[in-house]
Amino acid sequence: MARQLATLVDRQHYLNLRLDATTSNRILDMYLDSLDPDHSLFLASEVEEYKNKYGANFGVALKTGNLAGPFAIHAQYRERLKQFYEYMLAELKKPQNLQQKDAYLEVDREKSAYFKTTTEQKAQWQKMLVSQLINLTIAKEEELAKQKALKANPSLANGQDLTGPEDLTPVQTLTKRYT
């Protein structure tokens, strides 16, 4: 299958792309971006290692059916995703400060560089966690206000189900999400 796909790209794609080093590197970049679109799981050193090890020959490897590179990268991705979930679950057991001043979370990281260190990476993960907790807290408050208004004046419901959503705290919601 990999060989057939590579041959189609190489010979029959409407852009008439050749699977040379440049195209191989672009395919590798697209693969990495598909796994880690926010550049928050892989480290810069890992991406550089993948590019050095697999980049120029990614297309040739696909042509020959050699999927060792994509499988190795995907294995690292799965391991890092597991670390991310474990980190989030461990942090959810600790009290979180939701009233931080001057904290900034870069939410659109598609064009951002990969983190150089796990310290930078975990700082981003922590900001993501706090942001998710704040968003869930606000959503819960809005839902409670909506339910209160609907119960006080059922005609506002206009046929809607008046039962509220599952009654979970933001921490419980995220714990459920990451398990």
Give residue spans per PLM region.
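Flexible, low-complexity junctional segments that flank or bridge functional domains
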Residues: 1-179
